[in-house]
Amino acid sequence: MDAAAAPEFTEEALEAGRLLFAGKAEFVMGVVSLSGLPPADRSEVCFAGRSNVGKSSLINALTGRAKLARSSAEPGRTRELNYFDIGDEGKLYLVDLPGFGYAKVSKTQTAAWTKLIKSYLRGRPSLRRVFLLVDARRGDLMDTDEEVMDLMDGAAVTYQVVLTKVDKVPKGEVEKIVVKIADKLKKRGAAHPVVRMTSAEKGFGIPELRAEIAALAMLG
């Protein structure tokens, strides 16, 4: 499948996505160790990405709640796996992973986060997909993105690249970026072939990402 030409969703799929995120959306807990994880009793998806990639803004756009996920005033300060309960009747956990790649974070902190994230990715049976957020303004994957992909390939955890802030880049350039990244994903065993394009500020790509996540929530 050509990732530059992502398949269209049916009206039913888009409506399922709308309904899921129109329901309950609550912060549940921040987890600092595997012993603190909630029961794996529903599907989980998680958002990963470099610090300041726009994870909090995207979560808020998906849920339609401006302050559900709060970005830290200082990049790299989020040290927890933040769990959000999405949808009525406990349908889905959305997990916001700590941002990576921020230079001012100490090596000790980085090592601790990395260990926690590795353990989570390898040992969470209810994890359906990791959405790896990439700032479109970067123009390509960063080395740290590729390192996280290596980790997920090794753990056999399916992941999908989501471009953020595409409204900040000319349309023609965004399409070139998608093609470039999609070509790299073809060489990776655990990568989903479709690169999603989003803008939390403009709402672009939000209905489609909701539909994508809703389909995963139905896996139970």
From Swiss-Prot:
State the protein's purpose: Necessary for normal cell division and for the maintenance of normal septation.
Q: What is this protein called?
A: Probable GTP-binding protein EngB
Q: Which cofactor does it need?
A: Mg(2+)
Q: Which GO terms describe its molecular function?
A: GTP binding; metal ion binding
Q: Which gene encodes it?
A: engB
Quote the InterPro entries the UniProt record gives: G_ENGB_dom, GTP-bd, GTP-bd_ribosome_bio_YsxC, P-loop_NTPase
Source organism superkingdom: Bacteria
Any idea where the EngB-type G domain is? Answer: 41-219
Q: Can you tell me which residues the record assigns to a coiled coil?
A: none
Keywords of this entry: Cell cycle, Cell division, GTP-binding, Magnesium, Metal-binding, Nucleotide-binding, Septation
